Amino acid sequence: QWGGMEATRIIAVRHGETSWNVDARIQGQLDIQLNDTGRWQARRVGHALSSEQLSAIYSSDLGRAHETARAIADAAGIPVVAHSGLRERRFGLFEGKTFDEIHQTWPDHAHDWKKRIPEWEPPEGGESLLQLRERVTRTVSDLAARHCGEQIAVVAHGGVLDTLYRI
């Protein structure tokens, strides 16, 4: 218990591999699907979590996370609830590029990104780390409040999970 409320246990899962993960290409909020390895990984995590008592499975609404969540849902026998608040960070112009391409085209931005400056936003619609933290905190707090004393799975992206681990 915490503050008079029962804690919610959250099992956080990153989506399976995509071809863009293999190429080290920034996906952001582009809807890139799992590759064969990613589908295998999704089935494996579904099997690994099949003995867990899950009250709910929440997923980013992007295909790579949702497909991973469906594998968990198939094993658990409950539906996936898609939530846009679990989407990956918006990377603006950087989406679809590798870090080397970003560094060559926008060296100052690449430097700022690498330094993890909380207020810095990727050019043309990118999301700062502070904005990402606010979104992830709000989303996960809301999901946890709906399931006090229960266990849920949250299937998302590397940036979301990195943020979740830091809050």
Model-predicted segments: where are they?
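A short local structural element in Rossmann-fold oxidoreductases
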Residues: 23, 69-70, 103, 114, ...
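Phosphate-coordination/substrate-recognition cap region in phosphate-metabolizing enzymes
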Residues: 44-110
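Aromatic-glycine hotspot motif
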Residues: 6-10, 50
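Short, Lys/Arg-enriched N-terminal segments with co-localized hydrophobic residues
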Residues: 1-4
